[in-house]
Amino acid sequence: MGNRSMGREDTLGVLPSLLFCKMLRFLKRPLVVTIDINLNLVALTVLGLLTRLWQLSYPRAVVFDEVYYGQYISFYMKRVFFLDDSGPPFGHMLLALGGWLGGFDGNFLWNRIGAEYSSNVPVWSLRLLPALAGALSVPMAYQIVLELHFSHCTAMGAALLMLIENALITQSRLMLLESILIFFNLLAVLSYLKFFNSQTHSPFSVHWWLWLMLTGVSCSCAVGIKYMGIFTYLLVLSIAAVHAWHLIGDQTLSNICVLSHLLARAVALLVVPVFLYLLFFYVHLMLLYRSGPHDQIMSSAFQASLEGGLARITQGQPLEVAFGSQVTLKSVSGKPLPCWLHSHKNTYPMIYENGRGSSHQQQVTCYPFKDINNWWIVKDPGRHQLVVNNPPRPVRHGDIVQLVHGMTTRLLNTHDVAAPLSPHSQEVSCYIDYNISMPAQNLWKLDIVNRESNQDTWKTILSEVRFVHVNTSAILKLSGAHLPDWGFRQLEVVGEKLSLGPHESMVWNVEEHRYGRGHEQKERELELHSPTQHDISRNLSFMARFSELQWKMLTLKNEDLEHQYSSTPLEWLTLDTNIAYWLHPRTSAQIHLLGNIVIWTSASLATVAYTLLFFWYLLRRRRNICDLPEDAWSHWVLAGALCIGGWALNYLPFFLMERMLFLYHYLPALTFQILLLPIVMQHASDHLCRSQLQRNVFSALVVAWYSSACHVSNMLRPLTYGDTSLSPGELRALRWKDSWDILIRKY
């Protein structure tokens, strides 16, 4: 026993010394950490940052569309609701993030282009994110070309073209969204290519999932910045669908494996983008909870969900409309203007300008402002009283009602008389008894459009209703036409008999509401001016607010169809247009959105060259003549699908758009052409040049071409950065096309 105990003690004493000796031997070896650094990527990133961040705060003045985006940033800083029909809110929130990081309080009057920024505006921070996005697009172009299996030299060529292209530099140095959109477009393409290339050797690995999910996230971000982002999203979805179709035909994969692949792609490329898109709007609506200048575009229910504004006015209103209720009725359509059902003592003219006669009854219009004459009383046709019973008797779907104008006590009426501006519809009026053979026709059936059951009650703000005339089945409708001077330019209201469905112009909702208690007219008039008393909460769900906001953004039309610098898609290809962004108030220094004409023209020629070569190869392959090895052919086809497809999807839809278009709309399409240009050059060198001499000559021509592109970029630099005041002669020398609008001061 004693020997065993001694043995244990010896062992315990030896173990620490053995461990110590091993640690000493470990420390004698050098600790080596290997890091692969692509110096090309580092150099391109540094150069991209230098070209985009250099003197970023200059000019310290509002440049072109900064006047609009700056307003939206101020709204975010002050939590004020706004509506911008140009795109979803993610891009605006990114710009606002720059303002928040710089400590911007939102106090600046964004009223004109060229206005000097006050000291409280962090110009550098506001322009930082677009500049970073523009800078990082340069190394991303390099990586995309590498992932397409072309050479490092070709990848460097694409990145350098992105680096020196003047229009891309200008657009990324300002508080604008195009550079951020291009960044996420390229990130979506790069992520998908990395995912696709990892498919063969490591499916379902961490990297595989990372790149697949990042593809969906990038696509969602692109769409969330501008609706134009959906074009690149469709490009990625199309290529992914083709690859998935090939995957289904792969007999080496089991059914479970194929199903797993398809589910992974569906989640990453469909579910994730939809979720993120909704998340952008959720954050947007959570931030903008205060009433703002665009409230009236939205429905009453939406307005009531905002702090202040209508929420303040409608706070405490009864929820259910009852017989005897005093209400204002707002048109749900909001087109051409948000307006309320209105009447006044003036009558329709006996004879209209076109010689037609009228009923000479009291005018009924839709008035785009709050007014005491917008109030109506919901009357039970079987009772004479205009007060609410105790307890109130709610109005339900299908009930017959009369609408009494609050200030004149005349009843809403329609009859078989043509409306003043819409002769195919009936005139709507408030009935005046002239003791002639024209009886009152003032009964209306309530139709709750968004009812859940036929027993639904008419609710303030929430219910969308139609008024169907009992005698003629005409529906109360806002025609949208402006009445002449005798109607004070207010909007025409008609009775529509040819209705095919519940159009928005026929739908109304109660915005302001109170229970009438006064038996005499003077008492009722006092009530119309008095505040409400009951408090009913009307918080809209997120999906209801999102649906309405999205619909308004898609259907809201800007009436400005012409602009000094608007252009057509055909002018973009040959760079026949430019945009003067900013002019120094005292010197001739100016900033223009003007592309590098060498790059733009060459990119268009490369697109034509690729298309011709592709169809030539395709025809020859049909004849079983393969000019390219299979690997080279597949790389050539994928490059064309991405670059030509990306260019076409981001360019051709503009021919179908009826809206103002500007040169910057072409920039996302241009980036895909720039990626294609060096690819076509490498293809020409590798497969079209037959001898080494031809390759050497072609390489020399490419170097000369790159030098000319750099020379043009340097010549246009004063118009890109706006930091140099040129003489009138120098400015005229830069006007290489008659269509370019270079600003020359007259001294």
Curated annotation (Swiss-Prot):
It catalyses: a di-trans,poly-cis-dolichyl beta-D-mannosyl phosphate + L-seryl-[protein] = 3-O-(alpha-D-mannosyl)-L-seryl-[protein] + a di-trans,poly-cis-dolichyl phosphate + H(+); a di-trans,poly-cis-dolichyl beta-D-mannosyl phosphate + L-threonyl-[protein] = 3-O-(alpha-D-mannosyl)-L-threonyl-[protein] + a di-trans,poly-cis-dolichyl phosphate + H(+). GO terms for biological process: extracellular matrix organization; protein O-linked mannosylation. Its main location: endoplasmic reticulum. Keywords: Endoplasmic reticulum, Glycoprotein, Glycosyltransferase, Membrane, Repeat, Transferase, Transmembrane, Transmembrane helix. One of its GO terms (molecular function) is mannosyltransferase activity. The keyword ATP-binding does not apply. It comes from Rattus norvegicus (Rat). Pfam families: MIR, PMT, PMT_4TMC. The chain crosses the membrane at residues 30-50, 90-110, 121-141, 176-196, 205-225, 228-248, 267-287, 597-617, 636-656, 660-680. Glycans are attached at residues 435, 471, 539. Its EC number is 2.4.1.109. This is Protein O-mannosyl-transferase 1. Transfers mannosyl residues to the hydroxyl group of serine or threonine residues. Coexpression of both POMT1 and POMT2 is necessary for enzyme activity, expression of either POMT1 or POMT2 alone is insufficient. Essentially dedicated to O-mannosylation of alpha-DAG1 and few other proteins but not of cadherins and protocaherins. GO terms for cellular component: acrosomal vesicle; dolichyl-phosphate-mannose-protein mannosyltransferase complex; endoplasmic reticulum membrane; sarcoplasmic reticulum.
